[in-house]
Amino acid sequence: MTLTDLETCAEEIATAARTLARDGHSGGYSAGLPDHLRPVQRTLIANASQVLALASQPADLVRQLALYNQLLACLRWLGEFQVLACIPLDESVPFEDVADIAGVPECRLRRLVRPLFTIGFLCEPSPGHVAHSVMSKQFVTQPALLDAILFMSETLAPSASAMGTQTRRFGASEQAEDSAWNMAVGSDSPFAECLQQRPKVKRQLGAYLSYVSSSIDAGVEDTLTRMNWQNLGMATVVHVGAQSPSLVVALAPQFPSLRFLVQTEAKAESGGHQPCLDNHGISALKLASIPLHLRARITWGTRLSTATQPVLDAAVYLISIPFPSPQSPAMEITMRVAQALKAHVEVLRNNSDARLILTLPMSSATRSMDAAARAAVSLSDLSLLQLTNGGSLNMGEIRDLLRSRSDGLVVMREVRSPTNAVIAFEIQYRVDNDDNRY
């Protein structure tokens, strides 16, 4: 990065900061951010990261790594003794009272929380008293945040530290039971087996993956907005295999003429054959996450992943493939792509105007990606390596799978933003495959 780049980043930071300031959140945004400001926040953070990289000296990097290493240890200690839950959400209390409730020495409590004050986590409003900050309060009301921290400190950090031992013993082995995690815990069983036996670790892994992949999710939204949605009119978009309504909630305000169906995956024993447009399987929590003014345009349904798509009149079938994880390795995800294509052949054949849009995370970081996207790709890849010796999606295999089909499905367009880590394939049914490939 040059000095000109530094000036450009500084200007973009100033512009983003002014936009956020105009929103009127004087207390900061730790408690949440309106959807329309999320791109502004990402721009601010991405440029700040670039400025930090340019301005830092090697000694600054050492100090930063030392600080975050200790902060992670402090957060783990708080989690182990459930200290955060011992502090009232809206008032300060003496350190002594918190220490008594948590059953920890007061002197240790004071020393371990004060480093966290430097990052806006907890605060000392008056001498000898501790209180929640806006940020730390979220770790009480949203337990998944603490689950992610505990997974990093208890499972991922020891695994990362064992990479040298793993390499000396197993080299470039791809066997799941030869991973750095196996070295760290002294187990001969693969990490996937641990997840089956320890629900707590499985829950923590899910929380960790949801937060580190958040920029991938933002990239899906960004990439999809580059597709040609305006000419669809009063059409229906089906989000196939959705884990949550977050993507359609993000898209709905941008395309007010569209209706959306959030189609979750049904269990074989839970009524998977019931009509897809019935609102069964919806939880109160998921419903509450949809803004009231959008609920009239968002409906719910379920479908077995192996079943043919029952919604016949949609204009777009949207399938978002996640990054590989210990629970869903790359080979399994490639099989899911093939399964999803097979499930939609009939509906696309009967409606040649309909499109299937398949989004996938990029398998490696590129120079054009912003800092958050590069970090998400690297974190996901390293986590997979350390825990299972697994690898990223092979985009060559995915492209071969899409190009070699003989059922009439053809990739009409490949779309991606240069700054994020998501690629989208627009697929339609064509009788003459050879003349319509991208």
Swiss-Prot record:
It is found in: Nucleus. Residues 95-114 bind DNA. PANTHER family: MONODICTYPHENONE CLUSTER TRANSCRIPTIONAL COACTIVATOR MDPA, PUTATIVE (AFU_ORTHOLOGUE AFUA_4G14580)-RELATED. The keyword Iron does not apply. It comes from the Eukaryota. Interacts with aflR. Gene3D superfamilies: Vaccinia Virus protein VP39 (3.40.50.150), Winged helix-like DNA-binding domain superfamily/Winged helix DNA-binding domain (1.10.10.10). GO terms for molecular function: DNA binding. Keywords: DNA-binding, Nucleus, Transcription, Transcription regulation. GO terms for cellular component: nucleus. Residues 65-134 form the HTH iclR-type domain. Its main location: nucleus. InterPro entries: SAM-dependent_MTases_sf (IPR029063), WH-like_DNA-bd_sf (IPR036388), WH_DNA-bd_sf (IPR036390). The keyword DNA-binding applies. Transcription factor; part of the gene cluster that mediates the biosynthesis of aflatoxin, a polyketide-derived furanocoumarin which is part of the most toxic and carcinogenic compounds among the known mycotoxins. AflS exhibits no DNA-binding capability on its own, but forms a complex with the other aflatoxin cluster transcription factor aflR and acts as a modulator of aflR's DNA-binding by decreasing its DNA-binding affinity. This is Aflatoxin cluster transcriptional coactivator aflS.
